């Protein structure tokens, strides 16, 4: 049993009450008057007592006989049920209970995911990455409704569409209404992500759910020393080459030039997962690919990164060692919400930069740019 920590027990004119505070005032949640038995049981719950221990408390208080213990057991169950119904006791919440349907599994790079949620989302976005059941790195659970408790913590990021909070052991994501998502809780080690969506019988927000899960993915991959770079990619001579630049620079256009001129397969139109394995850098396929629709579940050794700049003429410029590190760091979308997370990104950038070719390419949209 877990208590909603936004309630305190206080005595009003000699009568014990449970009083809500914080966000529960705004929701609003009612104050609850306790009788003697309720106050005793509340104190036991605060001590972490089990149902059997709570029953023993009452039996000792009232010197109950064996026959009376049966009636007291019903009282304890009714009391616990009432606290759960009011959101004061978080005993059997959807988050802790999970979903009864068998999970589906998918693999992205070296990581395996257990998924319970809308089948349409899995079929549309993860089926190409499906795998057999095995030990998983992240459990993904999508539920309809509100969480039993409201997490609190320091605000890390706030925009019109999204607020990210640090609630201690988890990151909490609060989305704008158009997403069709109430919130998402992701453990800091990335091992579990629970997304609470609004009722959506027509699955109009399936794509929003998919994009929201990317945040949970980024948390896990960073913990596993894998990082995501905003870039398009193509395959050339058995290696993945990335084209990176700010939105609208022409990443997809430049990759398409290589495809048209040299028949290089396109790997992803927007994002690439990078890691270093046995001192060799790799690019791993991702299902997230922007609006391009171009993605692959395969992974390849990483050949290099081209940092794109629009220009009137085509020109290649070499980069100094510090510029290589900075360019990689600035194109990452892996979390940098805290100093520690930023340093993780920096350390990877420093490790990756000397292992690959990279340059700045000033270019036009003409075939000569490739």
Residue spans for each PLM region:
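Short helix-coil junctions and helix-kink-helix linkers
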Residues: 57-71
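Hydrophobic positions on the alpha1 helix immediately C-terminal to the Walker A/P-loop
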Residues: 254
